[in-house]
Each structure stands twice: as structure tokens, then as C-alpha cells.
Amino acid sequence: MVKIGVCGPVGSGKTALIEALTRHMSKDYDMAVITNDIYTKEDAEFMCKNSVMPRDRIIGVETGGCPHTAIREDASMNLEAVEEMHGRFPNLELLLIESGGDNLSATFNPELADFTIFVIDVAEGDKIPRKGGPGITRSDLLVINKIDLAPYVGADLKVMERDSKKMRGEKPFIFTNIRSKEGLDDVIAWIKRNALLED
């Protein structure tokens, strides 16, 4: 089972990305989802209502505190959810774990996630990639979402591309508009090639 952690600031599109990935990949792969929220299970409920996945393949973890701690320093609640999901589905191939909304320093405990996708959105401004932080610099894949909003918020995608290359070196990043599915095929191709080790 490959575990992919998806993190990023509140409203960046983490849940939308996971919903789109399950919609496009669950026909071919044995998948499940774990979501994290501080005081609710709102993202899990959204997934249950909108995803093609059955309810028993989605677990919502209510962290009750700092979202970063629940995926990094004390990942015990999430590790228990991983164990529970693996018990339900022993042949699970791909588990997507969504962090609660966090800042640019969010990273996953290596025991919890084999790969990390960090999601930011253009509406936060084109300066976000150059601000760095472990989410930007260390994630296995950076997804720059909501590119359709660039002209409305004065964000320059060329600046974001330049700064992402500078901050990430050889690590990949993908521009997306998850709502319209633009860039989604590239994210899926990255998962298949890097996490699932397909050609």
C-alpha cells in the first residue's frame, strides 16, 4: 500500500484534488481516503457525498488541535486510521491522507506518508512559492491550483513558475485548475510514475 499525504493551506483545493483523484483512479486501483479536520469531519462528509467511493473507504479524523501535529509530531490518530483502513481492505493499493488546512511548514511524518503532495493556490498571490517553507521545498510534488484566478488576483504564473523552480530545484510542480480538471492528468501521471512505479 502506497500512502500519499496531501497538505496545504485552508481553501487551496486539497479536498477537491482528492475527490478528483478518487473519481478518476478508483476504477483502476484499490483506494481509500483519510481526512483530517480540527473540530469537524466536514471534509470526510464532503467526500462521502461527492466521491465515487463507498463510505467505508473514507475515514475522518477529528484532530482537536494543531493540524500540523496530527500529521507530523504525534501522528498516532492518523496511524490508527491507516491501520483500521488496511484492516478493512487488506489489498489496498493507494491511500490518500489529507491534512487539515495548515501553513507552508506542513510536512508528513515519514511513517504516515510515503509521498507528499503540497497544494497552494494562486489566490494567495504569486509570492507564495518564493516564501519557501518545507511544504514548498520538500514536498515530492507541488500543485499550484486555481490558475484560472490569476488574472483576477494579479498573480503572474511566470513568476510562480520561476520561483517554484528556484525553491524546488529538480522537484516537480504542476499548475492546475482542479475544478475544470486542467492539470489533473499530469498529477495522476506523476502518481502512477512515482508512487505506483508504473511506466
From Swiss-Prot:
One BP term from GO: urea catabolic process
MF (Gene Ontology): GTP binding; GTPase activity; nickel cation binding
Gene3D superfamilies in UniProt: P-loop containing nucleotide triphosphate hydrolases
InterPro entries: CobW/HypB/UreG_nucleotide-bd, P-loop_NTPase, UreG
Sorted UniProt keywords: Chaperone, Cytoplasm, GTP-binding, Nickel insertion, Nucleotide-binding
Record's subunit section: Homodimer. UreH, UreF and UreG form a complex that acts as a GTP-hydrolysis-dependent molecular chaperone, activating the urease apoprotein by helping to assemble the nickel containing metallocenter of UreC. The UreE protein probably delivers the nickel.
Protein's name in the database: Urease accessory protein UreG
Organism from which the protein derives: Helicobacter acinonychis (strain Sheeba)
